[in-house]
Amino acid sequence: MDSSSSLNSTSRRKFLTASGGLLAATVAGPHLASGTSGGSPDARRSSSQNSLPAGAARKIPIGVFDPVFDHLSLDEMLDKVAGYGLEAMEIGTGGYPGTKHCPVGELLADDAKLRAWKKKFDDHKLMVATLSCHGNPVHPDPKIAARDAEIFQRTVLLAEKLGVQVIVGFSGCPGGSPTDTMPNWATYRWPPEYAQILDWQWKEKVIPYWKQAAKFARDHGIHKLAFEMHPGFVVYNPMTLLRLRDAVGEEIGANCDLSHLFWQGCDPVEVIHLLGKQGAIFHAHMKDTVMFKDNVNKYGVLNFAFETKDLSQASETFRAVGYGHSANTWKEIVRAYMDVGYQGILSIENEDPILPGEVGVERAAYVLKNVRAELLGSVA
């Protein structure tokens, strides 16, 4: 049952005000209550401005990224997602997300199987909005690089057949020299050898590969390659994303996953305006991050935790939407996507160690449906 449908406008506003850090403390226990929700982009707006003018914004579809349902069959997953009242899906086609719900080779080889696969989504009124093949096609190990480059190409071919316009992934990260065997994530240009590493990576590996890959995508009718700005890869913030876009072309854009930008100190609304006004946001992951101020003060921000056993010493960890930053903050984030005319979906990716799996998806969907309804002046 869609629990959000029973909220009236008054209770929804109370929910928007009260969620976020308070919910995190209630669900996760006292050691998380010291977390801070970070900046407050909602402070820019008058608290009385709850909704947008009629006709001012598109109702951005809310969806989910499928790896969180790897324990379910395709049919079971679709039943579950439709039951949450969601409208779209992001489907893994290889690389880190895997292919649990998308047998890429079979679908490329057999049009009848492709139609039957797509019909399952149509029957559940779910749009296949994006295909995701996060990998490292510029890995210094040539076997890994070739494997991930092939996964990308097969994803492009499948997107062409399905009429999907957006492919999501990582920029990748090369080694630091022609003889390296492991990736080298350099972010600081001193001592001098790090400047040499960065220059070599971009000029010799990253830009040449993505120019070729973007042409392949373009030749098959795909014009939106959405890079998640993720630590460990050469594109990890808006500046590096725009650098690659400037070098390769307008096929390069962002998968704007704010969970990786909160801890870097980025203002989410500023990021959306910066990239969105250039038409450079192609996809948006909905995932939160909670910052633990006491630990940030002691250890800095490069101190992430992925498991509950490490949280007492962590500076930050992933949370479901509304459990790291307030629902009012997320309302301003969704408002910003509407303001810049974003044409993609809001894709829930749940990696919350406290609300794992489907629980976090359901909580995030509840928050997002209600903030969207509040902005549009409608019932969730």
Question: Can you name each region flagged by the protein language model?
Answer:
Residues D2-L23:
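N-terminal secretory signal peptides and thylakoid transit peptides that target proteins
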Residues S19-H31, S47-S48, E76, K120-H124, ...:
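Active-site acidic/histidine proton-transfer and metal-coordination neighborhood
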Residues H31-G63, P67-H71, D79-K80:
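C-terminal segment of N-terminal export signals and the immediately downstream linker at the start
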Residues L52-A57, L78-G83, L108-A129, V156-K161, ...:
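Acidic (Asp/Glu)-rich catalytic clusters
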Residues K59, A88-M89, L131, W190-A327, ...:
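Acidic/histidine-rich catalytic cores of soluble enzymes
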Residues H71-V81, R147-V156, C266-L274, W330-E332:
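Short, acidic/polar
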Residues G92-A116:
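Glycine-rich, proline-tolerant flexible connector loops at the mouths of alpha/beta enzymes
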